[in-house]
């Protein structure tokens, strides 16, 4: 379990949340919430990492297990770390770092 805000994965997420330049350079962005992570899993998105905490719903936990079985890097974090990363008032307990699609926009 990740409990420190100084962890390299936490620093990556914070950078992606904070600066457009970081997202562009990394080719990644952050999706937060059970529904967004679920939709990304159904789609053709490439996951870099999924972070979740103990407040995650049963539906979300099912999603985490499915992603773990697919070989996605899934990490549990403390509730305080998740709250520090969350962009919402009441975090849903899950977020994912996804790679931008390589498909050209027509």
Please state what every model-predicted region is:
Residues 1-63:
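Boundary-proximal intrinsically disordered activation/regulatory segments immediately upstream
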Residues 14-21, 68, 86-89:
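Generic secondary-structure transition motif, activating predominantly at the C-termini of alpha-helices
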Residues 24, 45, 67-70, 89-91:
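A generic structural signal for short, non-catalytic loop/turn and secondary-structure boundary residues
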Residues 28, 48-50, 73-75, 92-96:
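Structural motif
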Residues 34, 54, 77-79, 98-100:
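Fold-independent oxyanion-binding glycine-rich loops
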Residues 44, 55-73, 102-106:
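Short, glycine- and charge-enriched coil/turn segments that flank and shape catalytic ligand pockets
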Residues 66-87:
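A glycine-rich helix N-cap at a beta->alpha junction
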Residues 81-106:
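Hydrophobic alpha-helical segments and helix pairs
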């Amino acid at each position: 379990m990740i409990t420190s805000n100084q962890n390299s994965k936490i620093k990556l997420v914070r950078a992606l949340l904070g600066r457009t330049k970081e997202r562009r350079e990394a080719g990644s962005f952050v999706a937060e919430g059970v529904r967004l992570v679920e939709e990304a899993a159904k789609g053709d998105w490439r996951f870099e990492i999924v972070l979740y905490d103990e407040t995650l719903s049963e539906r979300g936990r099912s999603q985490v297990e499915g992603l773990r079985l697919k070989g996605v890097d899934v990490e549990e974090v403390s509730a305080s770390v998740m709250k520090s990363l969350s962009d919402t008032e009441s975090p849903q307990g899950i977020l994912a770092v996804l790679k931008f699609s390589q498909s050209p926009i027509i």
